[in-house]
Amino acid sequence: MAPEKSLERATFGAGCFWGVEEAFRRVPGVVETAVGFMGGTVENPTYPEVCTGRTGHAEVVQVTYDPGTVSYRALLDTFWDAHDPTTPNRQGPDIGTQYRSVIFVHTPEQEAEARASKEEMDQSGKFRRPIVTAIEPAGTFWRAEEYHQQYFAKRGGGQCRTVW
């Protein structure tokens, strides 16, 4: 594993975080994932609070990765492949603002790459509808309860829709 100082962080919201986390865990160069919440107004929200839709948070996966092994662009490709970025506030049967498609950027370089990648995906013809993914500055990451961490690895994936 690379020394910690050379690792970088990326944060993505793409629907139910259980399946999205598993998609990123499969990427070589990803050294750690954690699921949680970002983008809301309540400090240290719980899963039940976020599910009300009143906190403003999105379910997210925070990815720690070795940029010498995997590029941020490759992580963006995984993000686009893991969900339908054309549906606002919904992924499959999961409906609510917590399931929105969002890229939380940690650096100006990530923002530039995310915007370029979104434009390329929008122009690619892969999707019949426009991409609604938001690109926002990363805020505080609130780690979800432990039973949500690596949920698929612990329990299997029958409860969550993912596209991978």
From Swiss-Prot:
Q: What class of enzyme is it?
A: oxidoreductase
Q: What is its EC number?
A: 1.8.4.11
Catalytic activity entry: L-methionyl-[protein] + [thioredoxin]-disulfide + H2O = L-methionyl-(S)-S-oxide-[protein] + [thioredoxin]-dithiol; [thioredoxin]-disulfide + L-methionine + H2O = L-methionine (S)-S-oxide + [thioredoxin]-dithiol
Q: What does this protein do?
A: Has an important function as a repair enzyme for proteins that have been inactivated by oxidation. Catalyzes the reversible oxidation-reduction of methionine sulfoxide in proteins to methionine.
**NCBIfam families named in the record:** msrA
The entry assigns this protein to a family as follows:
Belongs to the MsrA Met sulfoxide reductase family.
Name of the protein this chain belongs to:
Peptide methionine sulfoxide reductase MsrA
Q: What organism, scientifically named, is this protein from?
A: Methanoculleus marisnigri (strain ATCC 35101 / DSM 1498 / JR1)
